[in-house]
Swiss-Prot record:
Its EC number is 4.99.1.3. GO terms for molecular function: cobalt ion binding; sirohydrochlorin cobaltochelatase activity; tetrapyrrole binding. It comes from Archaeoglobus fulgidus (strain ATCC 49558 / DSM 4304 / JCM 9628 / NBRC 100126 / VC-16). Homotetramer; dimer of dimers. Co(2+) binds at residues 10, 74. HAMAP family: CbiX. This is Sirohydrochlorin cobaltochelatase.
Length: 132
């Protein structure tokens, strides 16, 4: 069974936003945890949209991870609407164009996000910036 991952970010006109998303995509791809890893954007004018990314994938099951800090409209309404899933919070499983799709929870409450916040501060001393 081929497994895929779509990382969904908000989207921005700034190139750096896409570059950061690509960095995470590449790291996950190199881990070998999934057969395919793609990025997509929830903002309507950014491509690819999540449905487009899913259509391009040759996988039996695709996990969609919202790279968002909490449940906002993109996670509770826009993403489910786009894939024909019920609105609201929580993990959602269903089928989209013949593929099993699982919309995961946004990452904001994960303990690793807490550690990333702390690391952002601790990194200052290691990089030789900030504290003197």
């Amino acid at each position: 069974m081929r497994r895929g991952l779509v990382i969904v970010g908000h989207g921005s006109q700034l190139n750096h936003y896409r570059e950061v998303m690509e960095l995470h995509r590449k790291r996950i791809e190199e881990s070998g945890a999934f057969d395919e890893v793609k990025i997509a954007f929830a903002a309507r004018k950014r491509r690819p949209m999540p449905d487009e990314a899913i259509r391009e994938m040759n996988c039996d099951i695709i996990y969609v991870v919202p790279l968002f800090i909490s449940y906002g409209l993109h996670v509770t309404e826009d993403l489910p609407d786009l894939l024909g899933f019920p609105r609201g919070r929580g993990i959602k499983e269903g089928e989209f164009e013949g593929k099993k799709v699982v919309i995961c929870e946004p990452i904001g409450e994960d303990y690793f996000v807490t550690y990333a916040i702390l690391n952002s501060v601790f990194r200052i001393g290691r990089d030789g910036k900030g504290e003197e």
